[in-house]
Amino acid sequence: MRGIYICLVFVLVCGLVSGLADVPAESEMAHLRVRRGFGCPFNQGACHRHCRSIRRRGGYCAGLIKQTCTCYRN
């Protein structure tokens, strides 16, 4: 029984270590999502301008009913 617990702890620690080692580079990171609003869902241009103001390339309304302004970098 003690061996099973040791194996379980070992597997959990290995999973945590492998998860921490898989941090993406900055160029591989996902789009920046900002809080709701900034024109979404009815004025996508306001979202785009907001993203440009925070030095992103642009933005669009995303989500289930386009309520979240999502900025893209490249």
UniProtKB/Swiss-Prot annotation:
Tissues where this protein is expressed: Expressed in the hemocytes, fat body and ovaries.
Subcellular locations according to the entry: Secreted
Any Pfam family matching the protein: Defensin_2
Cysteine disulfide partners in this protein: 40-61, 47-69, 51-71
Propeptide: 22-34
Keywords from the named record: Antibiotic, Antimicrobial, Cleavage on pair of basic residues, Defensin, Disulfide bond, Immunity, Innate immunity, Secreted, Signal
GO cellular component terms listed in the entry, alphabetical order: extracellular region
GO biological process per UniProt: defense response to Gram-negative bacterium; defense response to Gram-positive bacterium; innate immune response
N-terminal signal peptide: 1-21
Record-linked PROSITE patterns: INVERT_DEFENSINS
KW Ubl conjugation (keyword) present: no
Family, similarity comment: Belongs to the invertebrate defensin family. Type 2 subfamily.
Stated role: Antibacterial peptide mostly active against Gram-positive bacteria.
Protein name (database record): Defensin
